[in-house]
Regions:
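Leucine-rich solenoid repeat scaffolds
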Residues: 161-236
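Mid-chain, structured segments of secreted extracytoplasmic proteins
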Residues: 61-97, 217, 231
Length: 236
């Protein structure tokens, strides 16, 4: 009996040791590594080790659920294949030197809750496909070179809590749908040429107090969710 228990224990440990993410996810990560010059990162990846041991990568139940590579000297572009990380819940690539455009394929990563690519050199328009990220709570795209308008599709992200597009070259108006979201706590649009529509008010945003978000709501906006539009004097 003792030998049998030992055998099962060894088989279990062996299964855990050799458990890996799917080939599709690993391929997407390696594409990403190559396209952002992984060999010159501050902390690189060793492809001969399990993906779970790669710097900044979080694996749960053999699925890649988070990639956090802030301040890691990423240079290059984001490959279309990044959309194959369909189980990803958090993608944090802020403060690197990523260029090119934001791949439309990111709109297929429907488990994403956080997408943060602040302080890079991305350009072009913000893809309409981001409106497919129904679980998205945090969207941070500040200090890039995005142009065009904020996609109207973002007005359908009912779980969005923060939209930060500070310091880009965006124009147009804020999507009307965002004015009706009770979850939205912070809207940062300063240092663009965005026009605030009548559905938004210049108000002060306070910290959340337990379950109550403390907004000062002008009487004319009683029927709407009032959001904070931060100015260039803000540091967040």
């Amino acid at each position: 009996m003792k030998k049998l228990i030992t055998l099962f224990t060894m088989l279990f440990m062996s299964a855990c040791l050799f458990a890996q993410v799917s080939e599709g996810e690993k391929h997407a990560l390696l594409d990403f590594y190559i396209s952002t010059n992984g060999d010159t990162w501050n902390t690189t990846w060793d492809a001969n080790t399990p993906v779970a041991e790669w710097h900044g990568v979080t694996v749960k139940n053999n699925q890649v659920v988070a990639v956090n590579l802030m301040f890691n000297n990423l240079k290059g572009h984001l490959p279309t294949s990044i959309g194959q990380l369909e189980n990803l819940q958090s993608l944090e690539l802020s403060f690197n030197q990523i260029t090119g455009t934001l791949p439309v394929s990111i709109g297929g990563m429907t488990q994403l809750k956080t997408l943060a690519i602040n302080g890079n050199q991305l350009e072009g328009t913000i893809p309409e496909s981001l409106g497919n990220l129904s679980n998205l709570e945090q969207l941070h795209l500040s200090s890039n070179n995005f142009s065009g308008s904020i996609p109207s599709s973002l007005g359908g992200l009912a779980n969005l809590e923060t939209l930060n597009v500070f310091d880009n070259s965006l124009t147009g108006t804020i999507p009307l749908g965002l004015s009706q979201f009770s979850h939205l706590k912070k809207l940062v649009i300063a240092e663009n040429d965005i026009i605030a529509a009548d559905t938004f008010a210049q108000v002060n945003l306070f910290e959340v107090d337990n379950d109550n978000t403390l907004f000062k709501t002008p009487k004319t906006f009683k029927e709407k969710t009032v959001l904070a539009i931060e100015t260039s004097d803000d540091t967040d």
